């Protein structure tokens, strides 16, 4: 791939507040550089000393990194530990037993607090119940549940027994669930009767029944159902059991089974941009170490913080920064069942004010849709809420456009909270490139610098480094403890996907285009490599054009894809959501012309979208990710063949077929 041209310049810089630096885990850039130098000097020693200090090992490791079968790397492999013990038992031993582990807020606003002692007991009772059903170390259990304390209990109970969990997001269809049950070879499925979202009860057990009826799931002997709503469900005697009955009468202690550091803690399927889902397999030791280290470094977690990650446990963010990281750090966190727009789009700000949240971590797509709502209705604008408890903000899931970053910084953080714009992936296990809140000067739209120990670089299509200021392909040059171990059942696909021969088979391919600033070396993610457009020989990242569109005061959100064009090779197609009602006919044409001229002024005439399509919103998965493959099909006028079961709003597809 030739250098991606970066055509936007971002010059605003925001330094960490002095008061934050003074108390930070990593205070100032000298402290950051010292950690990076330590990792450069003695890479294995850097990781080993932290693994020994931060985790409880039943059997200490003597081997740090085994590269003999690269790229199937192993970390701490002769050591043994248990993830649930590290998250729960250690908190009982170090004085946190009565500390609140989870504040659960239901869809209807009811809040429940669960202490570390209570959580430990719930996990032990359920783990004992699973054991009584014959579930043991090495078995795979699929979890298809709503955001709930019980969802975390199910994950931790599997970890306690050494069973490998595979959480499937509660918005997936029966077919998607069945594919995952079959691929991972599940012996049990844990689900709920229904889930509550935005005041509506949505089926889960009924979808699980349909998935099992599709066949191939004969190994699933037990279906365990959490009674969330009390809604009517079909029941298969001998197979189906209520979660409360599985736990009933069980002792509230359960020995945590020690497993090898390399034992698969979980398999999490990514919807991979192509076809068959990929089961990303994560280890126990290396994964847990990084979950805890990044809680301390990126989120600067302190004993009195109230941490809120708005992700779902069905995604990796909900694994690392809900189910494992905060508990391993002994933190108090919020788990939220509902959606940001119910009962109105002030829900997030209201919850931050009521619970006095100090660290808030959410997705750019949520921020952008809430900007639109706030600007349309004064009553739910963040300025109506007391957000003074916040000290740190974060973003996750995709790059954040500079204008959305500025709105977040001013309106939510009141220009005093650092923003950690965290670049990472399902496959990386935890944060990779991110500002450190007490050290890194912030630049809107840039994820800044790799964490100490993460050897990120930008290369051309032959695997050679490109100079700062030239775009290229983001890679990681050395293995790190929390990295993906393999694709479940498909090691060849793992090698091809992440360690391609074209790059010499030794570099981890992130799949993102990126550029480093000439002076600061800061990384900016330009979008997925397959989101790079080639217009008349100019290569441009879609992210830049989207950022330019969103910088226009009338635009709430934009997504850009390419489509074949006889003249230019590829034409730019923009899907736009305005901060006002969707325009039509002559008005739509006029606004489309204005936006084309705006992009030409911001970036240059080469970046002008050929098609502009207006929708009430963009097609997104229920985790808020824009479904770009779907947009590519729409841009090309193709039939939609993708699985649209996770689509939040299917009706908008018709709107987006009309080009201006």
Swiss-Prot record:
Catalytic activity reads: acetate + ATP + CoA = acetyl-CoA + AMP + diphosphate
Q: Where does Mg(2+) bind?
A: 550, 555
**N6-acetyllysine (modified residue): where?**
625
Could you describe the post-translational modifications of this protein? Answer: Acetylated. Deacetylation by the SIR2-homolog deacetylase activates the enzyme.
For activity, the cofactor(s) needed are: Mg(2+)
In alphabetical order, the GO MF annotations are: acetate-CoA ligase activity; AMP binding; ATP binding; metal ion binding
Keyword vocabulary terms for this entry: Acetylation, ATP-binding, Ligase, Magnesium, Metal-binding, Nucleotide-binding
Q: What is its EC number?
A: 6.2.1.1
UniProt: CoA binding residues: 197-200, 317, 536
User: Residues that bind ATP, according to the entry?
Assistant: 397-399, 421-426, 512, 528, 539
Enzyme class, top EC level, equals: ligase
Identify the domain of life. Answer: Bacteria
List, alphabetically, the Pfam families matched.
Answer: ACAS_N, AMP-binding, AMP-binding_C
The processes (GO biological process) annotated in the record are: acetyl-CoA biosynthetic process from acetate
Instruction: Pull one GO CC term from this UniProt entry.
Output: cytosol
Question: What family, per the record?
Answer: Belongs to the ATP-dependent AMP-binding enzyme family.
Q: What does this protein do?
A: Catalyzes the conversion of acetate into acetyl-CoA (AcCoA), an essential intermediate at the junction of anabolic and catabolic pathways. AcsA undergoes a two-step reaction. In the first half reaction, AcsA combines acetate with ATP to form acetyl-adenylate (AcAMP) intermediate. In the second half reaction, it can then transfer the acetyl group from AcAMP to the sulfhydryl group of CoA, forming the product AcCoA.
- Full protein name: Acetyl-coenzyme A synthetase
Q: Which organism is it from?
A: Cupriavidus pinatubonensis (strain JMP 134 / LMG 1197)
Name of the encoding gene? acsA
């Amino acid at each position: 791939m030739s250098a991606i041209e970066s055509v936007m310049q971002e010059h605003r810089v925001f330094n960490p507040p002095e008061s934050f630096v003074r108390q930070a885990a990593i205070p100032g850039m000298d402290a950051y550089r010292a950690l990076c130098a330590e990792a450069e000097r003695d890479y294995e020693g850097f990781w080993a000393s932290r693994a020994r200090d931060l985790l409880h090992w039943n059997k200490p490791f003597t081997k740090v990194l085994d590269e003999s079968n690269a790229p199937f790397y192993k970390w701490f492999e002769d050591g043994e530990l248990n993830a649930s013990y590290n998250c729960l038992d250690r908190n009982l031993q170090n004085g946190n037993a009565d500390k609140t582990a989870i504040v659960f807020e239901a869809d209807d606003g009811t809040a429940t607090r669960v202490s570390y002692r209570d959580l430990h007991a719930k996990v032990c009772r359920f783990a004992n119940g699973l054991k009584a059903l014959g579930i043991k170390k090495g078995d795979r259990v699929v979890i298809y549940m709503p955001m709930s304390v019980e969802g975390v209990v199910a994950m931790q109970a599997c970890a306690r027994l050494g069973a490998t969990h595979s959480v499937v997001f509660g918005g997936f269809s029966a077919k998607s669930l069945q594919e995952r049950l079959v691929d991972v070879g599940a012996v049990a499925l844990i689900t709920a009767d229904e889930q509550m979202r935005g005041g509506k009860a949505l089926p889960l057990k009924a979808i699980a029944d349909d998935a099992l009826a599709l066949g191939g799931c004969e190994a699933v002997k037990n279906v365990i159902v959490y009674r969330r709503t009390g809604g009517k469900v079909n029941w298969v005697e001998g197979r189906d059991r209520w979660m409360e009955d599985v736990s009933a009468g069980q002792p509230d202690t359960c020995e945590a089974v020690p497993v090898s550091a390399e034992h698969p803690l979980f398999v999490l399927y990514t919807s991979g941009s192509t076809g068959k889902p990929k089961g990303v397999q994560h280890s126990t030791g290396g994964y847990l170490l990084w979950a805890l280290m990044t809680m301390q470094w990126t989120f600067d977690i302190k004993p009195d913080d109230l941490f809120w990650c708005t992700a779902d446990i069905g995604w990796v963010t909900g694994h690392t920064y809900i189910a494992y990281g905060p508990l391993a750090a002994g933190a108090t966190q919020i788990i939220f069942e509902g959606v940001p727009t119910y009962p109105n789009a002030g829900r997030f700000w209201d919850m931050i004010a009521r619970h006095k949240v100090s660290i808030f971590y959410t997705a750019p797509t949520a921020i952008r849709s809430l900007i639109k709502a706030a600007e349309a209705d004064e009553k739910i604008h963040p300025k109506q809420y007391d957000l003074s408890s916040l000290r740190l903000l974060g973003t996750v899931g995709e790059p954040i456009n500079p204008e959305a970053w500025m709105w977040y910084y001013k309106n939510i953080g009141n220009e005093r909270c650092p923003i950690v714009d965290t670049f990472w992936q399902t496959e990386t296990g935890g944060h990779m490139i991110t500002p450190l809140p007490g050290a890194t000067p912030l630049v809107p739209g840039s994820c800044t610098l790799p964490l100490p120990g993460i050897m990120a670089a930008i290369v051309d299509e032959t695997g050679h480094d490109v100079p700062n200021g030239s775009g290229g392909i983001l890679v990681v040059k050395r293995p790190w403890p929390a990295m993906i171990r393999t694709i479940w059942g498909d090691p060849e696909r793992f090698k091809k996907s992440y360690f391609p021969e074209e790059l010499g088979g030794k570099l981890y391919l992130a799949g993102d285009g990126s550029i480093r600033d000439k002076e600061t070396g800061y990384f900016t993610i330009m979008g997925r490599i397959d989101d790079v457009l080639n217009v008349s020989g100019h290569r441009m990242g879609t992210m830049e054009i989207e950022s330019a569109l969103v910088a226009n005061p009338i635009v709430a959100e934009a997504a850009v894809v390419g489509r074949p064009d006889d003249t230019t090779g590829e034409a730019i197609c923009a899907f736009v959501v305005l901060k006002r009602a969707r325009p039509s006919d002559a008005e739509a044409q006029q606004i489309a012309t204005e936006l084309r001229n705006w992009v030409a002024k911001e970036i240059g005439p080469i970046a002008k979208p050929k098609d502009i399509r207006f929708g009430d919103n963009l097609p997104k998965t229920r985790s808020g990710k824009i479904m770009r493959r779907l947009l590519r099909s729409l841009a090309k006028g193709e039939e939609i063949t993708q699985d649209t079961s996770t689509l939040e709003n299917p009706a908008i597809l018709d709107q987006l077929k009309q080009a201006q």
